[in-house]
Amino acid sequence: MKLGSPALSRVLSPAVRARVARHAGRLGSLRRSAVLGALLLAVGAPVDAEAKGLTVDDMLAMQRVGEPAVSPDGKWVAFSVRDTDLEANRGRLDLWLASVDGAQVRRLTTHPDADSSPAWSPDGRWIYFSSTRGGSAQVWRIAAAGGEAEQVTKLPTDVGGFKLFPDGKRMVLALEVWPQARTLARSMEEDGAKAKAKGSAQIYDQLLFRHWDQWEDGKFSHLFVWTPPELGGKADDAKDLTPGLTTDAPTHPFGGMEEVSISPDGKWVAYLARTGTRDLAWTTNTDVYLVGSNGQGTVNLTAQNKAYDFQPTFSPDGKTLAVLSMVRPGYEADRQRISLIDLASKKTRVLTESWDRSASTLLWSRDGRTLYTTADNVGHHSLFGVDVATGAVKVLVEKGTSGSPQLAGERVLFARDTLRQPVELFTVKPDGSDLRQVTRINDERVKAITWGEYEQFSFKGAKGDTVHGFAMKPAGFVPGKKFPVAFLVHGGPQGSFGDHFHYRWNPQAYAGRGYGVVFIDFHGSTGYGQAFTDAINGDWGGAPYEDLMKGLDFALQKYTWLDGKRMAALGASYGGYMINWIHGNTDRFKALVCHDGNLDERMAYFDTEELWFPEWEHGGTPWGNPEGYKKHNPIDLIKNWKTPTLVIHGGKDYRVVDTQGMSTFTALQRMGVPSRFIFFPDENHWVLRPHLSLIHI
């Protein structure tokens, strides 16, 4: 999974993005209208006029619920809702408020700029939030009872994120500064001097000189403590907790304020930062630091571990810090263990060593006896409770995709979605009983759609192992008829195509156009044990390809409504690589779609930014282990290409650079293979602007 944090980086936090970015990173994106148009031409899917399946317009109309924050009394939840503003060609975020019992819901903000990241004041009177009103990202607040929002911070630079102290009197802010400046005021002076400089040359002496979709400019995100003027602080200044830091806190490109935790007494701040200088591009060493809220006494709590450590979370009594940790340096998809650091002795205890799942969030119960977490789990992303004393794990909500757990009185509130339900908020008792839905933001839209029915299946794949997948019927399914097949290949490669409502790779969008959809969690996927995830290392085109072909054969035999003579395969990121590999190994598909996929693994090493990824996956560098890069390299099988192919790439994709897509298209054209290239000059590894979702070809 390649995104900026461990495997979720390919798919978001190193914990939260350890599926939002982690799953996101190498999961990739796909523009549905363009792709579906190509498939209709190549495969000829019927569209049932009676069945109103999911369309791209429906996806854009869905309101995206996120960022739940429960009030101190546990009775209310503030959350963000993203609407698509087609005229402005962007998403717009507003804040909403609902009672935890689901009886009441109302909109709090309606400003055309983005309002996000709600956080409650300790007395429950105010909801603080980030907003871009006025052209700069600052902290604002609005009364929970309603009214006009008021600006809280008025700093001379954007606030990248914030977290309130437990007493509500101070904040930790993430601000981009020049590390040598030492103070915010001096950093602003440096900005002024840089603005006056003539010329645009950028000079680099080390990697990473660009990351994800941004070129490095010498500034880094630091953590500051800001005190409001009425309590003795300065409106335009703050105390740097990380002076001189030459990496980002929170980490870039996907880290957020979940990487920062404040002790219950407000005396300490735990945070995450990359470790290293010249080796940043080929090390995964990320450590958890502890610093006094006065800026004194910084200590590295995880210096002994040279792999990922992230998601620091103080216990209710402030004596213990829970963190997520990997143990293998250089491997971003290692198992994420829950570790407990005793802050008095600085000793660490691994809580979940015997649990063969990767935890991705951390939430303490009020009594400190349970840690709630979520993890990929056999095609789902489940909610779990972990006993802090014994490490015993209990599944609380198994099916669907669960995330963002919060304490809500005597219940646990969390976000949940499935393949036929966008994210809504739910609560459950701590023992996993009495599941209740809190919000119904998209109920009417969901009811208006004929959803493709789906089921999970398993088969004997590579190495004789059990492999899982999903099959989805077209929205207009008619017994006795056969339907063309959209065969989706997930990215990562350490990711999962599970029971999740995805806004880029959504199988229902294909089912809505008359396709039967098949997607397989091949060797390398997450949620089936670490050995299964590790199996892809050094074997990118081996066991995964075998799983895909065997899984498709199994589905064609089991689901007789799938038409094996009319099939298209589609994938992005690693999935795009696999499309190129499939192209060289079989001609069973009528059409192929390659989005942001590598053609040449050797050159891809020199193109990409996070070198630890190919070095682990292919067993070293191209000069140290050339056979590792040659073993399953699509470029060596171009001579076999003959299937019509659509190639899609973004110009700001620095993970899988655009020349890989251009090279794929060049090879197709030179070979005389019917092909088309869609290039998005301003998009990165994902295509995010709403209007680009509506492109028809």
Predicted segments, located by residue:
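Short loop/turn segments that connect beta-strands within beta-propeller blades
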Residues: 99-103, 143-147, 228-232, 292-296, ...
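Hydrophobic beta-strand positions that form the internal "hydrophobic ladder"
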Residues: 74-77, 124-127, 171-172, 269, ...
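Short beta-strand element of the alpha/beta-hydrolase
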Residues: 481-491
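A flexible loop/linker signature enriched in serine peptidases of the S9 family
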Residues: 81-94, 109-116, 130-140, 148, ...
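Non-catalytic accessory segments flanking enzyme active sites
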Residues: 69, 172-175, 196, 200-205, ...
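Active-site-proximal cap/loop segments of hydrolase catalytic domains
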Residues: 506, 511-513, 519-695
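Residue-level detector of Asp-centered blade-edge/turn motifs that repeat once per structural unit
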Residues: 72-73, 122-123, 166-167, 264-265, ...
